[in-house]
UniProtKB/Swiss-Prot annotation:
Belongs to the CodY family. The gene is codY. InterPro entries: CodY, GAF-like_dom_sf, GTP_trans_reg_CodY_C, Transc_reg_CodY_N, WH-like_DNA-bd_sf, WH_DNA-bd_sf. Keywords: Cytoplasm, DNA-binding, Repressor, Transcription, Transcription regulation. The keyword Repressor applies. This is Global transcriptional regulator CodY. DNA-binding global transcriptional regulator which is involved in the adaptive response to starvation and acts by directly or indirectly controlling the expression of numerous genes in response to nutrient availability. During rapid exponential growth, CodY is highly active and represses genes whose products allow adaptation to nutrient depletion. Gene3D superfamilies: 3.30.450.40, Winged helix-like DNA-binding domain superfamily/Winged helix DNA-binding domain (1.10.10.10). It comes from the Bacteria.
Length: 258
């Protein structure tokens, strides 16, 4: 039990790095790989590899390609992972690769353990461990299930932070649009129609002539957006003005106005 305690304490140190920074999934994989002498993978619900560590001497080009190059597991394999809502310990590969398209596996003694990552009663991903010729003990499983709980909490926090960030960005855009006069709003709509994307070159005089407004209206509208931090602009002299959208919610909100 003392060995389990020491391993758990090492895991806790990752959490105690700082109370404000998110726990790196890669750090958890590295620790699990080191203390359990195994490969460790953290995969999102959609099969994206969020963190991984291979044990020393691990040789499997198929797995390395999926993890390092593709950074994603095949959809059929990920669906198989999601079918399990409880820990599946010590699964023998029986000479078959986990990826159906590969077929036979060169190693015959691979043992895997699959741990669902759950938060707020929702499946968020999967923690996968694999090693060769040695089953995972009960102490090992206690540690990895504890790790999966931590990962689930971090995934939830990341989702909540992303939601808060998206809400904030949307509010900033709505406030910026609210400061525009009717003619400035009309100018802005035509500006971003001309850009046809998140960045590009704008010739204010051409838009002014096309829409039938003064150039100053366009300049004022751009200044308001730049002050709000939703765009950045840079004068290129006679060529026009280079504009880049900084807040991705801007184009969505302008579409709603139309």
């Amino acid at each position: 039990m003392s060995s389990l305690l020491s391993k758990t304490r090492r895991l806790n140190k990752i959490l105690q790095k700082t109370g404000t920074e998110p726990v790196a999934f890669q750090d958890i994989c590295t620790l699990l790989s080191e203390v359990l002498e195994c490969n460790a993978y953290i995969v999102s619900k959609r099969g994206k590899v969020l963190g991984y560590t291979f044990s020393p001497g691990f040789e499997c080009e198929a797995m390395k390609k999926k993890v390092i190059e593709d950074k994603k597991f095949p959809e059929d394999y990920n669906l198989t992972l999601l079918e399990s809502n409880e820990t599946l310990a010590n699964l023998y590969n029986q000479g078959r690769c986990v990826f159906a398209e590969i077929g036979d596996c060169k190693t015959k003694d691979k043992i895997s353990t699959i741990i669902p990552i759950i938060g707020s009663r929702e499946r968020l991903g999967t923690l996968i461990l694999a090693r060769f010729g040695k089953e995972f003990t009960d102490d090992d499983l206690v540690l990895v299930e504890y790790s999966a709980t931590i990962v689930g909490m971090e995934m939830l926090r990341a989702l909540q932070e992303d939601l808060a960030d998206q809400t904030r960005k949307k509010a900033v855009v709505q406030l910026a649009i609210g400061t525009l006069s009717y003619s400035e709003l009309e100018a802005v709509e035509h500006i971003f129609e001309e850009l046809n994307g998140n960045e590009g070159l704008l010739v204010a005089s051409k838009i002014a002539d096309k829409v039938g407004i003064t150039r100053s209206v366009i300049v004022n509208a751009l200044r308001k957006f730049e002050s709000a931090g939703v765009i950045e602009s840079r004068s290129l002299g006679m060529k026009g003005t280079y504009i880049r959208v900084l807040n991705e919610k801007l184009l969505d909100e302008l579409k709603k106005i139309k």
